[in-house]
Amino acid sequence: MTEKLYLTSPMPPSVNHYTSVRTIIKNGKPLSMVYETKEAKDYKKAFKKIIEDEVKKQNWTREVNDTQHFYIDAVFYFDRIDKDCANYEKCLDDTITETQLIWIDDNVALFRPQRIYYDKYNPRIELTIYPVEYVGIFDSDVQKRMFETNCKTCKRYARNCSILKKAIEGRIQPEIHGCVCEKYSEIKN
């Protein structure tokens, strides 16, 4: 069974209200600086608390690493019908990332809006976060382990094979076709 984390986020600021720009004069020249809005800071503070509480309450014990990807299935409850769900992911993902409780960097987050409802009394986003089945270029952990088992009998493995490392990171390489490595060279006894 796949471990899942359920979160309910207040409505984050849209990308239009997440950051703003201020211009200052430095050494007689204008310099534009991007800063996080008060709305974004307030949202992040509130949502981080929710994440921390729910991780403990739901006993989310997954080890955080930089290669595990996660689905984030999102159900939106907007207060108005003129809103676009594509504008609300960034601040939400960044907030989850800042906790460092689920992932290290949101480059592993696969945000998937599932449905949109309208609730003017309680706007929110309900999230279901769970690890994907694939590992790098492999369709499953079983497929990765089979490939890795074969790698252990190759000369390159003892020298920290970069092909295996890149495959686990999800990098497409010309040396691998159909889960077979063209650079495989069996260790001679």
Annotate each PLM feature:
Residues 1-189:
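Acidic, proline/glycine-enriched N-terminal capping motif
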